[in-house]
Structure formats: C-alpha cells, structure tokens
Amino acid sequence: MGDNHQATLSNDPAANAPDAAAADKGKGKAADEPSLEMSMDEEEDSDESEAEEMVNDDDDDHDNLEPISEENIISGGRRTRGKTIDFQEAAEKLKAEDEMDDEDDDDEEFQPNDEDMRD
C-alpha cells in the first residue's frame, strides 16, 4: 500500500474538517471561561469600587475651596487679556489677609504636657 506513493483518502470527518489544522495554530476558537470565575471577578470589582467610593468621600471633606471674590468677576463679557496686574498691590493684600488669619491660630497657645510624652 505504501509502496506506490499514492495519497490515501480518509473518510474521517474530524481529520478533514476545514478548521482541524487551524485549531492547533495561533487563531483558534476562543475558549469559554467558566461562569464561576466571572462571578468572582464581578465580586472583586464591586469590592474595589466600594473601597474607592469610601476614599472619595473622605476627599470631599478636605477640599479647601474658598469662596470666589466678586472683585475677580468681570461684568460685560470683557476679556482679561492685556490687563495689567499690580502684583505688588496683590502681594500686600494677601499679606494683610494672612496676618488676620494668623491671629486665629490656636497652635501658638498649645503647650504640650511633658508627663504624657514619657515612655
């Protein structure tokens, strides 16, 4: 049989399938993942998102958003390009505001009790 170098045709449908050779190569059919793994991933994602939401809630408390000064609002729709700014005056104004804020600080009045700091 094998001496005459003729091809032997097989009637096996699995061997002659058009994608039989391609299944072992690079682009085969994608394997279905078990549904248990998907549910575990979904649970992990929900836990992570809950943790992120808790962290984001804390960030809202620490925002130092000061109210907008009405002096900075330009009426009439004018543009601010080309406006000359007196930085000296602005620095003095900020310095005066900072001095007023320093009067309210309680840190200067704090005196630690040395007895509490012992090992």
From Swiss-Prot:
Which keywords accompany this UniProt record?
Chaperone, Nucleus
Subcellular localization is given as: Nucleus
Q: Which residues cross the membrane?
A: none
This entry carries the following GO cellular component terms, namely: nucleus
Residue ranges annotated as compositionally biased, kind Low complexity, are 11-21
User: Is Nucleus found in the keyword set?
Assistant: yes
Q: Which InterPro entries match?
A: Histone_chaperone_domain_CHZ
- Identify the stretch(es) annotated as Disordered: 1-119
Q: Where is the composition biased (Acidic residues)?
A: 39-63, 98-119
The answer on whether this UniProt entry bears the keyword Nucleus reads yes
Renumbered to this chain, the Polar residues biased-composition regions fall at 1-10
Question: Where does the protein principally reside?
Answer: nucleus
Q: Which domain of life is it from?
A: Eukaryota
Basic and acidic residues compositional bias: what residue ranges?
22-32, 83-97
Q: Which family does it belong to?
A: Belongs to the CHZ1 family.
* Subunit comment: Forms a heterotrimer with H2A.Z-H2B, stabilizing the association of the histone dimer. Also, with a lower affinity, forms a heterotrimer with H2A-H2B.
Biological role stated in the UniProt entry: Forms a chaperone-bound H2A.Z-H2B complex that acts as a source for SWR1 complex-dependent H2A to H2A.Z histone replacement in chromatin.
Q: What is this protein called?
A: Histone H2A.Z-specific chaperone chz1
- Organism, scientific name: Neosartorya fischeri (strain ATCC 1020 / DSM 3700 / CBS 544.65 / FGSC A1164 / JCM 1740 / NRRL 181 / WB 181)
Kindly list the organism's lineage.
Eukaryota, Fungi, Dikarya, Ascomycota, Pezizomycotina
